[in-house]
Structure formats: structure tokens, C-alpha cells
Amino acid sequence: MMGVNSSGRPDLYGHLHSILLPGRGLPDWSPDGGADPGVSTWTPRLLSGVPEVAASPSPSWDGTWDNVSGCGEQINYGRAEKVVIGSILTLITLLTIAGNCLVVISVCFVKKLRQPSNYLIVSLALADLSVAVAVIPFVSVTDLIGGKWIFGHFFCNVFIAMDVMCCTASIMTLCVISIDRYLGITRPLTYPVRQNGKCMPKMILSVWLLSASITLPPLFGWAQNVNDDKVCLISQDFGYTIYSTAVAFYIPMSVMLFMYYRIYKAARKSAAKHKFPGFPRVQPESIISLNGMVKLQKEVEECANLSRLLKHERKNISIFKREQKAATTLGIIVGAFTVCWLPFFLLSTARPFICGTACSCIPLWVERTCLWLGYANSLINPFIYAFFNRDLRTTYRSLLQCQYRNINRKLSAAGMHEALKLAERPERPECVLQNSDYCRKKGHDS
């Protein structure tokens, strides 16, 4: 039940904190000894029951706050829980490393994939690979021992710098990929990156430099990380929190959503523009007449025009399919990115305003769930691109089957097969007239 303070008003503060932060020392609404009985004042009081919480079955909240700032919440796991959690975290780490290594190897060693637009995918894979190698193992160890940081003060700052830079680089690369896809679809002839491979490395370098701009301030005194013997937490300074979350997430997410909207709009416009109503059918009466030869000549000319129209429409259909595929791919990328990272950044933005700048008062399991959901984005990125890219799929399959020598040949054969499929549609004039009596008669005579 919700408590009532001395003035008769509902005790909203105590009610909310009893739900969000159980077992934590909370202020109590109680009149101070010399104060007016009608005025409530803050009198800190530690809640009872901490020993009971610490003695609960594993996994359980430790319930002790081991430093002055109130940081250091820990979870005591039993042996079975540690085995299950450790196995899951190890599997996530290994799959992330394997998937992103496949991307890097595929683009670097397969000639057909060495295109400027694929450099962005390599940059994304390197960022995600860095997360899996330099960040996730230390988070895994910290989580397995209940949330206590054991790697020291100096390495805490190094770890936070690596975590922020790699995750931000991954997010910003996804943003640049969305811009690249949009320009490639809407400006295929004028988009310079497609023709000039020198521009793409500059864009990638800009992404990593901007990511470093978020990493460096805590190292040079603008905002100090929360760092003691048991806690390693990024700075909770209000200004730095707003700056870092905006640059690392909210602005890139807004750009990605806008690019997806523009590609989706272009695909719908292309679908409406290139609808093919069908060819006009030639009536038999127009062929079988007294002036049959003249009529036939006119119909042959009309069929030739329709054949050219068919070629043009086939090209339009190819453009439409490419736009539709780009819209679908980018939509799934944006959706997965938002689902993975939005909870973490909402929590990171709100945390200083809820808990203050000294430490985090959010339950440890909530923070870790949101954090691992964000790390999962580094796992699924290479599989998303492989699912929508036939060349990457073929290369993955060949690498996993240790068939290294025939990769380029297989990609060339697959590309030729796709081109032949597009050219399979009939173009002969008499095929347009196949419903006419003349064509049926000609086929019967032959």
C-alpha cells in the first residue's frame, strides 16, 4: 500500500522507491524532532531486512552497499547459475567473433566484394569484432562474479574508453551505411563514392574520429568516470551524458530513420511509376482481311515497338526490385538496431537525473540486461548482411566448407545466372501476337 505522510498527502516518493530500489537505504518522510509537525523533512533511515536479503537463495541480491557513494551492488550466483550464464555469454562472444571475422575475410580476399560500398561493412565488422574481443570478455567476468569490478582503477578508464569508442563506431557506421544506401539508390550516376574509392576511407576515418571525441573527455578531465575498488561506471555528469548519448545514439538513429523513410518513399514512388498495365492484344480481324499484307506489316511494326517497351520495362522492374530490396534491408537493420540499443540509451540518459552523478541506483540486473541487448547488435549485424547479400552468402558457405580456390568462380557463375534469368523473357514480335489467328496458323504450318 502507498504510505501517507504527516500532512495527509500520499507518500509517492517512498512508494516509487520501494518498488524500484528494494533493499536500499531510503529517505523517510517523518517530522524532525524540532520541526513543525505539519512539515515533512528528510530523515535518512536504513531499511531493515538487509541480512535477510543477503541470506536468500542464489542468485540473490547482496544487499550491501560497500562504499560511501552507495555503489557496489552485487549478485551472488550459485554454481549452476554461473555455468549457465557463462555458457551463454561465451557462445555470444564466439559467434560475434566468428561472424565478423567472416565479413572481414570475405571482403578483403574475394575480388568481387572489394567495392567501396563494402568498405563500410568491413568497418562495421571491425568495430563489432573489437567489442567482442576487447569489451565483452571483461563484462562477462564481471557479471559472473556478481558485478564487482576486479581489474583495477587504471584499466577501468581504458575499458570504458574502448567500450564507448567501439560501440559508438559500430552505431555511426550503421548510420553512414544507411546514407550510402540512400544515395546509391536515388543517385546511381552522380553518387561519387561509387566511382571513387578514395572518398570512402575518409568517411570511415571520420566515423572513428567522431567516436573518439566521445571517448576522450573523461580521460582529460571534463567528466570523471565513477571508479573505485568495486565499481567501474562511465561518467554520470549531466552535460557529458547528454552530449555522449546524443552523438552516439539519438542523432544516428534519427538519420537512419530518415534515410529509411526516404528509401521507402522512393520505392513506393517507383512502384507506382513503373506499373506495367500489359500489352494491347491484337484482334484477329485486323489480320485476316482483304489488305492482309498491309495490316500484317503494321502489326509487325507495332510488335517491334512493344518489344522495345518490354526491354525498357524490364529495366524499370530491375530498378524497382533493387529499391525494394534496399528498403527491406535497411528497414531490418534499423529495426534491429533500435530494438537492441534503445533501452540501454534511454536508461543511460535518465540515470543521472534519477540517481545523481555519484553512482547508479538502477538495479544491476536491469542495467546488465540492457547492456547485453546492445552488445547483441554486434552479433546479428554480419548475419543480417549475409541474409540479404547473395555474394556474402556464397562466400560464407565456401569459407566454412574450406573451398577457398573457387570462390571468385562461384560468384561469377551466380552473377551470370542472375543476368540470364533477367534476360529470359521473350522479345520476338510474334510472341506478342500469340493470341491472334495468324500466329496460331503460322505455328500450325511449321
Curated annotation (Swiss-Prot):
Q: Which PROSITE patterns match?
A: G_PROTEIN_RECEP_F1_1, G_PROTEIN_RECEP_F1_2
The UniProt entry lists membrane topology as: Multi-pass membrane protein
Q: What is its main location?
A: membrane
Location relative to the cell = Cell membrane
| Binding locations of serotonin | D163
One GO biological-process annotation of the entry reads: adenylate cyclase-activating serotonin receptor signaling pathway
Q: Which residues are glycosylated?
A: N5, N67
Sorted keywords for this record are:
Cell membrane, Disulfide bond, G-protein coupled receptor, Glycoprotein, Lipoprotein, Membrane, Palmitate, Receptor, Transducer, Transmembrane, Transmembrane helix
Q: Which family does it belong to?
A: Belongs to the G-protein coupled receptor 1 family.
Q: Specify the protein name.
A: 5-hydroxytryptamine receptor 7
Per the UniProt record, the source organism is Cavia porcellus
Taxonomic lineage from the root: Eukaryota, Metazoa, Chordata, Craniata, Vertebrata
The gene that this protein is the product of is HTR7
